[in-house]
Swiss-Prot record:
It holds the Pfam family Actin. Keywords: Cytoplasm, Cytoplasmic vesicle, Cytoskeleton, Nucleus, Transcription, Transcription regulation. The lineage of its organism: Eukaryota, Metazoa, Chordata, Craniata, Vertebrata. One of its GO terms (biological process) is regulation of smoothened signaling pathway. The keyword Cytoplasm applies. It comes from the Eukaryota. This is Actin-related protein T1. The keyword Oxidoreductase does not apply. It comes from Mus musculus (Mouse).
Length: 376
């Protein structure tokens, strides 16, 4: 039988992403640990400080030993595709990163918009059957991000490593019919930058290292105010970058061209709307009574929204797309790469949240389907 006192223990907050997993404890202002969402399986026996023969490695440990490992990424485009590896990742986060016993603390977990029913139920089964958690809650990633901005109604533009989406939220609930997704995000920008660098003749081996190109992207790339001005603007940002091997590359047109694919995915051969039109379309697909409220509370979330200039470019294009005189406000907090996690920390700290949990007794009585009834 469930010990009710366990629901009073601070919850473990998971924000699982295609590129990074963030984990920490309810009530704290930021995640305790942020690790790469990767699991490495040894090609041969590898000694480890944790055990004489470790069967798998996760996060940075896996990436540092990539030569001797088969690397698996359990989350692709926001969705779990390798459940065995996902379970290993969660186990490592519980036991080694946080050092907690999963059967003693409730678990709050973010999930992508339009998460398939079978994925939600599989997550529920693993948490209750494998980890024996006392309670669980699955929360839409965008709802968590909006909560971090102290809002319950607004439009969230979320862009991480694997997917970009626009999610209208009304009084704390996402509106699925108006959600739009674009499968262009941080990973695609990194790959695009890699191709551009190779095409320019920078064929140093470390250019093929994703972590190196990610660093170039995060330190040097910006968004121009308008694509027609890109070439002119790029000349103002000529900068050098020293690679880990000591070689130097000079960034020019790469600097502004790469994030442009968020606004014009046609450049990657993807014939979908860019983020400005996605925002506008999502709002226009909502009831007319709330459209003005959504335009007035647009919240950016995810690491791929961190490019300098993105907020200004988005505002400029939305002013052109929206009806004349429509008030538009875009919130872009400095910690928005963690906003969904922070929202989870805030929500689970509220005394009223206790009634929201799917408890172990709920799972025992109704099965995994109970998550469809209590988490929506």
């Amino acid at each position: 039988m469930l010990d009710p006192a366990r629901l009073d223990n601070p919850a473990v907050i998971f924000d699982n992403g295609s590129g990074l997993c963030k984990v920490g404890i309810s009530g704290e202002i930021e995640p305790r640990h942020v690790i790469n969402s990767v699991v490495g399986h040894p090609k041969f026996n590898i000694p480890s400080a944790r055990s004489n023969r470790k069967r798998y490695f996760v996060g940075e440990e896996a990436q540092c030993m990539y030569d001797g490992l088969y690397l698996h990424y359990p989350i692709e485009r926001g969705l779990v595709t390798r459940w065995d590896d996902m379970e290993k990742l969660w186990k490592d986060l519980f036991e080694w990163e946080l050092g907690v016993k999963p059967n003693e603390q409730p678990v709050f977990m973010t999930e992508p918009s339009l998460n398939p029913q079978e994925t939600r139920e599989k997550t529920t089964e693993i948490m209750f059957e494998k980890f024996n958690v006392p309670a669980l809650y699955l929360c839409n990633h965008a709802v968590g991000a909006l909560c971090a901005s102290a809002c319950i109604t607004g439009l969230v533009l979320d862009s991480g490593d694997g997917v970009t989406c626009t999610v209208p939220v009304y009084e704390g609930y996402s509106l699925p019919h108006a959600i739009t997704k674009l499968y262009v995000a941080g990973r695609d920008i990194t790959e695009h930058l890699t191709r551009l660098l190779l095409a320019k003749g920078y064929t140093f081996p470390c250019i093929l290292n994703k972590a190196v190109v990610d660093d170039i992207k995060e330190k040097l790339c910006t968004v121009s105010l308008g694509y027609k001005d890109t070439e002119k603007n790029c000349q103002q940002f000529l900068r050098k970058y020293t690679l880990p091997d000591g070689n130097t590359i000079q960034m020019s047109d790469h600097l502004c061209q790469v994030p442009e694919v968020l606004f014009t995915p046609d450049h990657l051969g993807i014939h979908d709307l860019g983020i400005s039109k996605m925002v506008c379309n999502s709002i226009m697909n909502c009831d007319t009574d709330i459209q003005e409220n959504l335009f007035a509370e647009i919240v950016l979330s995810g690491g791929t929204t961190m490019f300098p200039g993105l907020q200004d470019r988005l505002l400029k294009e939305l002013e052109d797309l929206a009806f004349e005189g429509t008030p538009i406000k875009i919130t872009a907090s400095s910690d928005r790469c963690y906003s969904a996690w922070i929202g989870g920390s805030v929500m689970t700290s509220m005394t009223t949240f206790k009634q929201m949990w799917v408890t172990a007794e709920d799972f025992k009585e109704y099965g995994a389907f109970v998550v469809q009834r209590k988490c929506f």
